[in-house]
């Protein structure tokens, strides 16, 4: 375990950020109860996904592993931006590397896992966590912006954040995630 790094779990990326947002003044009053209900449903969906997996081994993660944090040089690829590094399930560092239609994502994931398993075993049950982790990331991201809203740089960079439209879009996005978490997980290869 990291000595000074938190875990990525339902509490740290879902429950705590949700409470922060619901106790703040960012969500318009006319949307707050709708948001509260959608967050409750979303977190219940996340719990169901974790229940499907059972025991989850936690490993050291990059935490924000996507193509924007992969720098290519003459020596090859290098990961950057480790400030979100934490303990969590291995799939967290894999799912954000995927893009496109489901068939494309299956192919990408299969290729990633072929290389990944040269270094570490992968528990295919963690595929049930992809949409749950996406949901937690969406919740955490809104709280991350809200917690830094007093910084003028954030107000300049995220002008759309403190608007009615932003929160309407988040409600719709979370409703879509609630449905996605009830779908079968992404499956790849013969063993996954």
Report each predicted region and the residues it spans.
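All-alpha amphipathic helical-bundle segments outside canonical DNA-binding/catalytic cores
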Residues: 124-134
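N-terminal alpha-helical segment
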Residues: 13-20, 42, 90-93, 109
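Active-site activation/catalytic loop segments of kinase-like enzymes and analogous catalytic loops
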Residues: 90-121, 137-153
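ATP/Mg2+ or Mg2+-diphosphate-binding catalytic cores
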Residues: 15, 25-26, 143-192
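Active-site acidic catalytic loop and adjacent metal/ATP-binding pocket
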Residues: 44-94, 190-192
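Charged, amphipathic alpha-helical oligomerization/scaffolding segments
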Residues: 37-41
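A cross-family kinase active-site recognition segment
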Residues: 1-34, 58, 157-158
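Short alpha-helical "patches" and their helix-cap loops
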Residues: 4-7, 110-116, 153-165
């Amino acid at each position: 375990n990291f000595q000074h790094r938190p875990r990525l779990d339902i509490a740290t990326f879902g429950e705590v950020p949700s409470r922060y947002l619901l106790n703040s003044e960012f969500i318009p009053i006319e949307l707050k109860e709708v948001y509260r209900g959608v967050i409750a449903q979303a977190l219940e969906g996340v719990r169901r996904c974790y229940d499907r997996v059972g025991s989850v081994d936690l490993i050291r993660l990059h935490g924000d592993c996507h193509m924007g944090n992969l720098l290519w040089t003459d020596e090859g690829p290098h990961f950057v931006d480790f400030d979100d590094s934490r303990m969590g399930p291995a799939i967290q560092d894999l799912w954000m590397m995927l893009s496109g239609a489901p068939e494309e994502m299956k192919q990408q994931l299969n290729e990633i896992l072929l290389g990944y398993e040269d270094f570490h075993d992968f528990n295919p049950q963690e595929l049930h966590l992809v949409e749950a982790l996406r949901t937690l990331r969406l919740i955490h991201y809104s709280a991350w912006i809200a917690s830094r809203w007093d910084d003028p740089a954030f107000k300049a960079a995220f002008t759309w954040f403190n608007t009615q439209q932003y929160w309407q879009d988040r409600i719709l996005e979370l409703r879509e995630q609630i449905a996605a978490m009830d779908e079968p997980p992404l499956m790849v290869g013969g063993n996954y």
